[in-house]
């Protein structure tokens, strides 16, 4: 189907298939040894030229509880906290149970207790520009209050070794809206393919093809405009080709018990490190990071 409406929502349309093909072409160089930038670019341009999708004005609207009308979504996996409840064989979405600590139950007045299994790597958190609003909108950080204003717990930006980590250490994913009174499942539909990905794939294709590199930086700046619009420095959204081609902002390495890097590991420059970082900041907690890490080496 080529239509984008209620009848095709949650189904893989022609545009979803093209986005999937673009993903495969994007990583073809590391999968097969033969880059397929032109093939990826063709699929991206088909989606862009369809005129059926656009960037959502507000980043948070992509991930809110009632997000089925998101103009950015190309393919979403529909979830429902009521109709899918108790059906372990059906599609269920309970990301908050994995990411939140047990103390978060009081923060959101939840009807169940989260498992508290995952937290953000401080090195990744520290790579964000402080004015990038995606840092605020993606991660629960600092003091956490109950609906009536009582301080429940604090999520510090630290994650020392497994032997020294407390249950509330590290920022937690707050990207997907959690309603007060949440159960073990959420009704947020998961945006498996979204228009921003298509734009970033196009930007990445243009760089190695050595054509229209200014166009590539313009596309990335367009995406970043949404992330910096509400900040004190919206001009930071604008980047150039040199920024995209520069090294990553992430300080990789292992952490000691005090949360300090004690082994820097591989310190080689990441080619297109700025673009690599942009993939991470835009799509954190959207189940695609490993694919990008493979592509960037």
Regions found by a protein language model. Name each.
Residues 1-89, 130-297:
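Acidic/polar-rich alpha-helix caps and helix-coil junctions
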Residues 93-116:
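Short, cationic low-complexity segments
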Residues 106, 113, 121-129, 133:
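A contiguous, surface-exposed recognition patch within enzymatic or periplasmic domains that forms
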